[in-house]
Amino acid sequence: YEIFTGKIEDDAMYIPPKITKGNIIKVREEDGTKRYDFQYTDRYGYTNTIGGISRLFDESFWNYAKLISGVLRYHMPIEKVVALIDGLHLDDENINTWKNGVKRALKQYIEDGTRSKGKCPQCGQEQMAYQNGCLTCLSCGYSKCG
């Protein structure tokens, strides 16, 4: 697993807004260092590559993304990764917004029916489970997304 996310300056890397898929390519340089390139196919069918994307991102975002990638690679369940991210106390408003976006994206991959600890805020029952990326009470139907 690899998580690639972060805040980037508008003029540092242009990807057309209609591009929703692409590939991240890990390139090992002759000196042993790694760099990551982003490759996508444009509307005309041409392959485009943006080299060295890791140099473009804010270091804080990049480091958190590497940490999340590592715990996913070692098979930490996605719902536990979401809880880990949720527990981060970050000072910067931008990185808190980033944190919420990462949680929202990862929740889409939690298997339906996965139980969560805690009581439903509406009915008080301990019947919370993930459905379609949202935490849902199996007793009363209360649902919280995001």
Give short role names for the model-derived ranges:
Residues 1-146:
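Long, C-terminal-biased catalytic regions of enzyme "large/alpha" subunits
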